[in-house]
Amino acid sequence: MSCFSITGAIKNYAWGSRDYIKSLLSIESHGPLAEYWLGTHFLGEAKTEDGILLSEKIGHRLSFLFKVLAISTPLAIQCHPSKSQAQEGYLKESLLSLDDEERNYPDDSEKTEVVIALSDFTALYGFLPLEGIKENLSSFVPELFGKIKDSSSIKEVLETISNLSTEESRKILSQLEEKTGNTPPLSFTLGPKELCALCLSLYSDDIWCISPLLMNVVNLKANESLFIKPGIVHAYCRGNCLELMSSSDNMTRLGLTKRHVDEREFLKIAYLDSTPSLFLEAMETEEGAFSYSYKEAPFSLIRYEKGIHTLPRIKDGIIFSIEGKAILKKEDEEIEVGKGEAYYVGEDDKMMIEAQGSIFFAYGDCL
């Protein structure tokens, strides 16, 4: 059976949760744990039980990166590049080291993402129609509305905000705080007002605290999903999720972060038009599994909850248990996968999985 245990790479960013990944992986930690990477990206590669890098074990790199995210405070307003944008940006930054904090492009790959909620989950996704933006700004920050009321595009609005003086920004943020407060909301269902208050509680001098007035607020329940194409502006705000993406760590940030921000590059690659949320509905298979796939994504994901299923025949895949256990079977061989455990699955015929819980199978190309 071409299948073996792997351990992912943990990222301890400040926005992470102090309990979710710790509990999922049954590990000790005294600080926030934000992400758990399962893949072969050089900035955080999975390893086998004996410490060998996954790419060395299998002789190539995966076409996808599979992550767990545990979010206690909002991530940066961000977007990811297309293939051509990534290649151009990577070349432009060639004099910087690959782990330099100033880099937007640590690799030359496009970045498409699918996010699957594991709990109640809130995100900002794409821009509202221009009239919706103007209506929100008129209600919450008349000072800013007066400056953008004649704008004919979302790009004009963003450029106006980007060019505000420090004093102008201070007045607008003060007006926003009067309307929304700056206390983190206790409710898990968040709207624009609550998200502005949350952002102000963390980044009180960042003009992009107004972002929830410009963007779609999306609240997902567990197992609901969003598809994020290159260029789509987004920010995850609160909750736990799985993220399946092209094997890339490229991003440009607009604000709401202490990490590197590049407004000029962001406005260059972002899709600056209104964007309806692309919900990705899981399709139930004949065997009772749930498939997440999108024709523009170079990867797929299946959720198994119970029963016995035939795994698709693939080049590379990763099985990961969020809850419960699974048994991988081939002829007389069996491997048990417990909560928080991950297994690499290579090219193999007629492998079966018996699931009891919430088991996810991420994979790239089918054979």
Name the predicted role of every residue range.
Residues 75, 113-123, 239-259, 299, ...:
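A short hydrophobic beta-strand segment most commonly corresponding to one strand
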